[in-house]
Amino acid sequence: MARYTGPDCRLCRREGMKLFLKGTKCFSEKCPFERRPFAPGQHGRAQRKLTEYGLRLREKQRAKRIYGVLERQFRRYFEIASKGRGVTGERLLQLLETRLDNVVYRLGWALSRDQARQLVSHGKIAVNGKRVNIPSYNLKPGDVVELLDKDLIPVQEAISVFGNKNVPAWLELDRENFRGRVLRLPKREEIDTPVQEQLIVEFYSR
């Protein structure tokens, strides 16, 4: 499956909620979802009742779009989660949350996960003192994440927006030195991603 290259705002309208894919634009009046909060297309306003399969598929698509993960990789996360200990759905979300690009976003160094992904890909992030340019790199408790270029305009914009926002309890942030630490894996109640993970589990288990 190729990476989606169309307008991000169409994805928000398709899912019927803001996915916060465009940074500051999502918080402004310019957000297309504010003006057209219905599915894209000529007949976007029509409400169709989804089948059980449709509901599960929709939930999977929503999670993939929020985290910016393609189908092949998303399925691999599910397979890992289903083989591990604990609740499969919660474990799936933990794998997604501990991706390096997501942690960079959660630490407030990027306005969106896509922007965080670019920071990682361009070599602006180090893990335990070593530069890492793989957005999907999964962090574990005790790992230290460091921002190597503090003066980038996108980083400064993110800090101005999220500067006073508390980071999730499973992360620790040293704002002065631009370092973060993974304290532990996140609990389900600490993950604010608007998805029903059980529907995703049911989709892949059918």
Swiss-Prot record:
Enumerate the GO terms in the molecular function aspect: rRNA binding; structural constituent of ribosome
SUPFAM superfamilies referenced in this protein's UniProt entry, alphabetically: Alpha-L RNA-binding motif
Q: Which SMART domains match?
A: Ribosomal_S4, S4
Query: One matching Pfam family, short form?
Result: S4
| Record note on quaternary structure | Part of the 30S ribosomal subunit. Contacts protein S5. The interaction surface between S4 and S5 is involved in control of translational fidelity.
What are the transmembrane regions? none
Source organism of the structure: Dictyoglomus thermophilum (strain ATCC 35947 / DSM 3960 / H-6-12)
Some GO term, biological process aspect, for this entry: which one? ribosomal small subunit biogenesis
Q: Which UniProt keywords apply?
A: Ribonucleoprotein, Ribosomal protein, RNA-binding, rRNA-binding
User: Gene name?
Assistant: rpsD
Q: State whether keyword RNA-binding applies.
A: yes
What is the protein name stated in its UniProt record? Small ribosomal subunit protein uS4
